[in-house]
Amino acid sequence: MLFIPKLFPAKLIRRYKRFLADVKRDDQDIFTVSVPNTGSMLGLITPNSNIWLSYHNNSKRKYVYQLEIVEANNSLVGINTTLPNKLALEAIQNGLLPELNGYKTILKEQRYGTQSRIDFLLRDDILPDCYLEVKNVHFIRQKELAEFPDTETKRGTRHLEELIKIVQQGKRAAMLYMIQREDCSAFTICRDLDPTYGRKFDLALKSGVEFYAVKCHVSVEGIFPIHRVKIEND
């Protein structure tokens, strides 16, 4: 996924109210940008860190600049939580998930379960329906190990419950963790920050829900899914 138009460099001053951040470009005055991420962004919000912004020439937007990338531990990290679905589709189409090959149709945002929407529903005349949920990942504490979640996620736990029900109906259900950074070789569940999610992950795994993780190359030119990473489940 290319950034068009190109991104603009800046320095982060602070993030607040989840959706907003104050930033500074060169010798310009401090100004406010939108943050397309409602999560904690643990470990990514460091004052004076290098960041990159996208520009949106839209009169309906209150803030025309939007935070896209932050630099953390000398690595570029994508923080836009609206991108993982696009990246997931690229990963499927580029053959990074051969387990999902062969489906004729990929439907987006389909209703299922109890007041939920699945990110992707894969359908075929021969293959069983496959319900695919996508999660954004950008949290790292240990070297080379990406983790999810970075805070308690009741919504994420509910999604696992819904996927378990799908498997019980004789269909395929899968969770794809899209890692918007390259400095990792493995992925794991962050059990200390959300034990409930960890237990539900274990139950889903035993129930037959499929789990995959893909990392991305992040640059100021674009973000691209590049490799599968192993999922560690201790």
Swiss-Prot record:
NCBIfam families: sfsA (TIGR00230). GO terms for molecular function: DNA binding. This is Sugar fermentation stimulation protein homolog. Belongs to the SfsA family. HAMAP family: SfsA.
